[in-house]
C-alpha cells in the first residue's frame, strides 16, 4: 500500500463477488458523524430544490449522506474554503470535503417489508426455487401475494410443510380451526409474500440437506439425479462462501452514489436525469406509503397490495422488464435499471472496464499487403509517429538534433525527412502487437515487425488472416506497442506471426491461403474466352523468357488475361500430355518441331530438346514466375 499526495492506492490479489447481507448493505451507506449522528438512510424521494437548486436533505442527492456538491463547502454555506477540511457543520450536518466523494459514498433505503431479489428469483436457473425445492411458478405465487404457504402445519392432518393454499382454501381452514368443536390445539401457521419466503429460507439447514442429498444421489438415476446434483451444487456454493439463503430476500437496498446517476440542468431551466433516480423515487414513495399504512393499522388487503407494489418497484430498479410490466418513462421508453447498466456489450464491464482506451495503441482499417513478409505488417507513418513518439523524442535529443522535448515535438509535427529517418531507426527491431476483436483464441493477437507505409490503413499479410478470422472488407484492427524490454522479447519470441503456424486448438496448420488469396490466385490464372489465341511465331505475342512477359505487362503492353507464347525450358504439365502431338514438322537443319495443343517443342536429330514455347496467359506467367522466384530464394 502506498501513500502519496493524500491518495491511497490499494493493491488487490483478486475481486470476489458474493451475496451481501442486509447488515453489510447498511454498512456501505452508514456513517457516524463526529457529533454522534448516524447518517446514510435515504428517506425522501426528493432530488433537488427547484428554487435554490441545492440537494434536498435526506433525499436522493442529500449532501449529509453523500458529501458536498461543491468542493470544501457545506450545504448552508457556513463553512467555505479548504482550511475547514474535515469539519462537520453544526447547522446542516454536511462534512467539509471534496465533492468527488459523491462518486463513491453510498446510501441505503430501509425497507418497511422484505422484498425478494429478482435476480435470484427469476434468474435462470432460479436459485430460490432450487434451494427450496419448490417449482418457480409456486414461488412466484407466494412472493407476489397470490397464494399462502404453510410454514408450520401444526396439528392439522391435511396440511403439509411448504404446501400452497389459495385465499379461499385458507379461509375454510381458518373456519375449521376456530370452530367451537375444533380439536386442533397447535394451530397451523401460514405466510405470504417475501416475508414467508424469508422464513422458508431461514428454516433451511444447508449442511444437513447437503448430507441427505449426497446419500440420495447414490440411489437415484436419470432426470432425478441431475436435479439433485444441480441442487447440491447451489447448496455447496452457499456453504463455501459463508452466505445465508435468507440474504436473497432484501431488508435494505443500496443507493448508488449520486454522481453515478447525475441530474444536470439544461438550457431553459429544465433538468435531465438518470433513469435510476426515477426508479429509486418509486421505491421510496411506495416504501414510505407502506410504512404509513402499517402505522395507522390499515386493513390487511391494502397493506398487502402496497407490499406487492413495493416488490414490483424493487424488481424494476434491479432489473426492469425481467418480470411483469416494464416501467416506462417519457416517450414510452423503458427505464434503464441497474442490470441494464451492467450487462451487455454497452454495459459497465464490457464497455468501460474491459473496453478501456489504452495508451500507446491505435486502430485502423486493414488492407492486404502482398509485398510483405509473413512476420511483417505495414504501419501508416501518421500512426507510427504518434505511437513511437517518446522513443523518437529520446533519440532526437540523444543525437543532438534538438535540445528539449518541446523542440522535438515541433520538429515531429513537421514530419520532415530527418524525423522519418529517426522513426525508421526506432521501429527497426521493435515489434508491435496487432489485435482483431473478438479475440477468441490466443492467435487473435500476434506480433509483427512494422514497416512504414503511406496512407492511413494497416497492411496485413494475407496468410495470417485465418488466425485473426480477418478479411479485407472493412475490418479494423488495433495496434499496441510493447514498451518494456521483457514484453518486446516475449512478443518476438512467442507471438511473432511466423512462430504461430499451427492452430493451438487442433494442431493443424492455420497459415493457409484463404479468402482473398484464393480469389486472387483464381483471378490470376483464369482463362478469359474473349481473348483470341495468337498464332505461333506472332512477333507481338512471342517472348523469349518469363521476365520479358513480366516487363511487357508492367509496361502496360499486355493485359493480365492475354494469351502469349513464351519460351520455357522447364517441366510443363499439359492436359494433352498423354496423347500424341497434333502435327510433327521436319525442319531443314534436321531438327523436328512437335506441335501440341498448347506448346511447341523443337528437338535435334539426337532427340534432345532445343527449345520449348508454351501458350499461356500473362497471369499464369506472373504466378509461375513468383513461385519460382520465392522457392529459389529459400
UniProtKB/Swiss-Prot annotation:
Cofactor note: Binds 1 Mg(2+) ion per subunit. Binds 1 Zn(2+) ion per subunit.
N-terminal signal peptide: none
Keywords from the named record: DNA-directed RNA polymerase, Magnesium, Metal-binding, Nucleotidyltransferase, Transcription, Transferase, Zinc
GO molecular function, one term: magnesium ion binding
UniProt keyword Signal present: no
Similarity comment: Belongs to the RNA polymerase beta' chain family. RpoC1 subfamily.
PANTHER family referenced in this protein's UniProt entry, alphabetically: DNA-DIRECTED RNA POLYMERASE (PTHR19376), DNA-DIRECTED RNA POLYMERASE SUBUNIT BETA (PTHR19376:SF54)
Function (record text): DNA-dependent RNA polymerase catalyzes the transcription of DNA into RNA using the four ribonucleoside triphosphates as substrates.
Name of the protein in its database record: DNA-directed RNA polymerase subunit gamma
Gene symbol of the encoding locus: rpoC1
